[in-house]
Swiss-Prot record:
Gene Ontology terms, MF aspect: antiporter activity; proton transmembrane transporter activity
Chain ranges passing through the membrane: 7-27, 106-126, 154-174, 189-209
InterPro entries in the record: CemA
Major location (coarse): plastid
Protein name, entry field: Potassium/proton antiporter CemA
Length: 229
C-alpha cells in the first residue's frame, strides 16, 4: 500500500488536470462539423437573444451611417449610390457570417464545458479511492514544506488573486467565461463581478488565516504577516 501511495498520485494528478480538457477538446473538434452543418442548414437564420440582436442592429446602423456620410461628402452620382447599397449589402452578409460563427463557437464551448464537468463528476464518483490517496499525498507534501515557503506561497497566490494588479486579470477571466457561456458583453456586470470577487476571496482568506492557521501553525501566521508588511 505505501508503494502504491507513493506511485499513484502523480499520474492521477496529471489525468485529473489534463484528461477532462483533452476529452472535451476531442469532442469539440468532432462535433464542430456537425454543429456547423446543423446551424447553417436551419430554416431560421438567426438565434439571437435581445442583447445580441440589439448589438447587431447597432453595428449595422453605424455601418450604414458611415457609408452614407462618406458618399454624401463625395457628392457622388446615382451609380455611386447604387454601389453604396451593394456595399452595405455585402457588409451585412459579412456581419451575419461573423455572428453565425460566434454562435457556433458558443454552442461548441458550452458542449465542451458540459463534457468537462461530466468527466470531473465521473472522477469524483468512480475514482473516490484514488482521490483520497491524491488528497493525502498533497497534504503530506504541504506538511513537509517549511513555514517560510508556505508563507511565501500564500503571499504569492493572494497577490496574484487579490493584489493591486489583479483586477485586470479578473476582468479577462470573467469576460472569457461570460463569452464562453453565450452571454453578450456587459461592461457593468463584468465590472461589478471584478470588484466583488477579490473582496470575497480576501474575506475568506482572512477568516481561514484567523480560524485555521492560527490554530494549526502560529509560526506560519507570524512569518506571513512579517512578509506581508
Amino acid at each position: 500500500m505505501p508503494k502504491k501511495k507513493a506511485l499513484a498520485p502523480p499520474p492521477y494528478l496529471v489525468s485529473i488536470v489534463f484528461l477532462p480538457w483533452w476529452i472535451s477538446l476531442s469532442f469539440q473538434k468532432s462535433l464542430e462539423p456537425w454543429i456547423t452543418n446543423w446551424w447553417n442548414s436551419r430554416k431560421s437564420e438567426t438565434f439571437l437573444n435581445d442583447i445580441q440582436e440589439k448589438g447587431v442592429l447597432e453595428k449595422f446602423i453605424e455601418l450604414e451611417e458611415l457609408l452614407l456620410l462618406d458618399e454624401i461628402t463625395k457628392e457622388c452620382p446615382e451609380t455611386q449610390i447604387q454601389k453604396l447599397y451593394i456595399g452595405i449589402y455585402k457588409e451585412t452578409i459579412q456581419l451575419v457570417k461573423i455572428k453565425n460563427e460566434e454562435h457556433i463557437h458558443i454552442i461548441l464551448q458550452i458542449s465542451a464545458n458540459i463534457i468537462c464537468f461530466a468527466t470531473l463528476s465521473g472522477y469524483a464518483i468512480l475514482c473516490n479511492e484514488e482521490l483520497v490517496i491524491v488528497n493525502s499525498w498533497i497534504q503530506e507534501f504541504l506538511y513537509n514544506l517549511s513555514d517560510t515557503i508556505k508563507a511565501f506561497s500564500i503571499l504569492l497566490v493572494t497577490d496574484l488573486c487579490i493584489g493591486f494588479h489583479s483586477p485586470h486579470g479578473w476582468e479577462l477571466m470573467i469576460g472569457s467565461v461570460y463569452k464562453d457561456f453565450g452571454f453578450a458583453h456587459n461592461e457593468q456586470i463584468i465590472s461589478g463581478l471584478v470588484s466583488t470577487f477579490p473582496v470575497i476571496l480576501d474575506t475568506i482568506l482572512k477568516y481561514w488565516i484567523f480560524h485555521y492557521l492560527n490554530r494549526v501553525s502560529p509560526s506560519l501566521v507570524v512569518i506571513y504577516h512579517s512578509m506581508n508588511e
